[in-house]
Curated annotation (Swiss-Prot):
Identification of the protein by name: Type IV major fimbrial protein FimA
Keyword Transmembrane listed: yes
Family assignment from sequence similarity: Belongs to the N-Me-Phe pilin family.
NCBIfam families referenced in this protein's UniProt entry, alphabetically: IV_pilin_GFxxxE
Keyword Transcription assigned: no
Organism this protein belongs to: Dichelobacter nodosus
Cellular location(s): Fimbrium; Membrane
Biological processes, Gene Ontology terms: cell adhesion; protein secretion by the type II secretion system
Assembly with partners or alone: The pili are polar flexible filaments of about 5.4 nanometers diameter and 2.5 micrometers average length; they consist of only a single polypeptide chain arranged in a helical configuration of five subunits per turn in the assembled pilus.
Amino acid sequence: MKSLQKGFTLIELMIVVAIIGILAAIAIPQYQNYIARSQVSRVMSETGQMRTAIETCLLDGKKADECFIGWTKSNLLGASGSPSSSNDSTADHPGQGGLVIDYKLEADATNAITATFGQNAAATLHGKALKWTRDPKATWSCSTDVELKFRPTGCKDDLK
C-alpha cells in the first residue's frame, strides 16, 4: 500500500516566507507613516480645541493665569521643556513641556498656541512644531514644520 505524504514541501514554505517578507517590507513603512500622520492630526485637534477657551478669555479681558484653558496633558509633546513666553501673558500648564500659549489682551495683537513634538511622538516628528496663530482680525490659522506628507488637510502652511 502506498503512503500519502501530507504537508508542504520546502520550496513551498520558502515561497510563502518570501511573500510574507515582501509584504512586511511594504507594510511597515506605510504603517509608520500612518502613525506619524495620526499623531500630527491628534496634536492639531488637541491644541485646536483651546482656541475657543482663549477666545473667551480674550473677550472677557482675562489674563492667562485667570483662565481655564481645559488642557489635558499630552504624551506626544515635550521637546522644549516647560511652557514659557516672552509676551504679556502665558497660560501655565505644570508638567507639560512643549506647549506654549502666548496671548496679549490688545485687540490688534497676534496670539499663538505652539506645540512641540517630544520623544513619545514618531521619530520623524521629534522636535517639530505645530502652531495655531490668531491674527488681529480674530482669524485662526495652522502652520507646522513637519514633512508635507504628514500634514493634516487643515494645516498645510509652513511654520514661520
